[in-house]
A protein has these predicted regions:
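N-terminal leader/capping segments at the start of a protein or of a new domain
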Residues: 1-60
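Double-stranded beta-helix
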Residues: 8, 12, 18-20, 29, ...
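A generic structural signal for residues embedded in beta-strands
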Residues: 21, 136-137, 154-155
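Conserved short histidine dyad/triad with adjacent acidic residue
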Residues: 25-27, 75-121, 156-159
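Terminal, intrinsically disordered low-complexity segments enriched in charged/polar
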Residues: 47-66, 74-79, 87-90, 98
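Non-heme Fe(II)/2-oxoglutarate
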Residues: 48-60, 65-69, 178-194
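Ligand-binding loop in jelly-roll beta-barrel domains
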Residues: 72-74, 144-151, 157-181
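A short beta-strand-loop-beta hairpin characteristic of the jelly-roll/cupin
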Residues: 113-121, 126-148, 187
Length: 195
């Protein structure tokens, strides 16, 4: 069962005193039938760096997209229910592409990847596992890692997928920041889908 999140946003009154501008349940959520058991909730989005702290009170408007805006960031929570192995066995990267297309990121899926939702974003993502446990799958199985409550991950534009193979839900808080590759560093980061 997915939960609701109270979101408190601070600001300033006309005299510059600190106030609470908004105190309500976060409403920008996304659940998709072609990505069963996963729910995303956005809390805040910025569209520039440095970010404005005296701008609008509500930034989570329009459709929920996977990646942050250019030069921006997204603060979000993702809840992963345990995966059903029978359902997973029937899915392919084409199913993953369809699910990610609903978030404006169909091209982010790794075609023929190890997991239907293996993907990559051009971003640096900071994640904190709040509860449960989850496998972070990489291109090669020997690099997979089991993350547990209290673990943090810094995802730097690499192919990955999330797989909850346990029996309890897993919740991860993320801050996604727009990113670029450093040219000439010799990291050998492959172009996405051969492009």
């Amino acid at each position: 069962m997915h939960r609701s999140y109270r979101r408190v946003v601070t600001g300033h009154d006309k005299n510059g005193a600190a106030i609470i501008e908004s105190d309500q349940v976060a409403t920008q959520t996304l659940e998709r039938p072609n990505r069963p058991g996963v729910r995303l909730t956005n809390f805040w989005i910025t569209d520039q760096t440095p970010a404005e702290y005296d701008g609008p009170t509500e930034t989570c408007l329009g459709p929920l997209t996977l990646k942050p805006p250019a030069r921006g960031s997204v603060f979000r929570c993702v809840e992963f229910m345990p995966e059903d192995p029978e359902v997973m066995a029937q899915l392919s990267s084409e199913d993953g592409a369809a699910a990610f297309a609903e978030m404006g990121a169909g091209d982010n899926v790794v075609r023929g990847g190890r997991h239907p939702w293996m993907h990559r974003t051009d971003s640096v993502d900071y994640g904190v596992v709040l509860n449960g446990e989850i496998w972070m799958l990489m291109d090669n199985e020997q690099d997979d890692v089991l993350l547990k409550a209290g673990d943090v991950v810094v995802q730097r534009g690499s192919n990955h997928a999330w797989a909850n193979r346990g029996t309890e839900p897993c919740t991860i808080m993320f801050v996604l920041t727009d990113g670029v590759t450093s040219s000439g560093e010799g990291k050998g980061i492959p172009l996405r889908n051969g492009n």
